[in-house]
From Swiss-Prot:
Alphabetical list of HAMAP family matching this protein: ClpS
Organism: Streptomyces avermitilis (strain ATCC 31267 / DSM 46492 / JCM 5070 / NBRC 14893 / NCIMB 12804 / NRRL 8165 / MA-4680)
Subunit architecture: Binds to the N-terminal domain of the chaperone ClpA.
A Pfam short name: ClpS
Record's function text: Involved in the modulation of the specificity of the ClpAP-mediated ATP-dependent protein degradation.
Entry's family note: Belongs to the ClpS family.
Name of protein: ATP-dependent Clp protease adapter protein ClpS
GO terms classed as biological process: protein catabolic process; proteolysis
């Protein structure tokens, strides 16, 4: 039988670690609820929802609604992930488009 040779092992350059590829939630960073603009809900209704659910004054609710309308989105609350999940579900219940994310400024 002849001599069998194996190719030399390749050196693989380390690129990104799993932490760099996947954003890992940081426990000290608060979460926020973001309401996005939609073509369905009236501005007066969005203001009403912010006043009713969050207890915001008419002025604050109107400012947030105008941010949603003109900027396309507004941060309407912040806190723990569980609290923000509850707020997002409530906004969905009112028919608003809302998401949550960590506030990584």
């Amino acid at each position: 039988m002849g001599r069998v040779t194996a190719p030399a092992p390749l050196e693989i350059e380390k690129t990104e670690s799993a932490e760099e590829v996947f954003a890992v939630p940081e426990p000290d960073v608060p979460w926020v609820t973001i309401v996005h603009n939609d073509p369905v809900n009236l501005m007066s209704y969005v203001t009403y929802v912010f006043q009713t659910y969050f207890g915001y004054s008419k002025d604050k609710a109107t400012k947030l609604m105008l941010d949603v309308h003109h900027k396309g989105r507004a941060v309407v609350s912040s806190g723990t992930r569980e609290e923000m999940e509850r707020d997002v579900q409530a906004m969905h219940g009112y028919g608003l488009w809302a998401t949550l994310q960590q506030d990584r400024k």
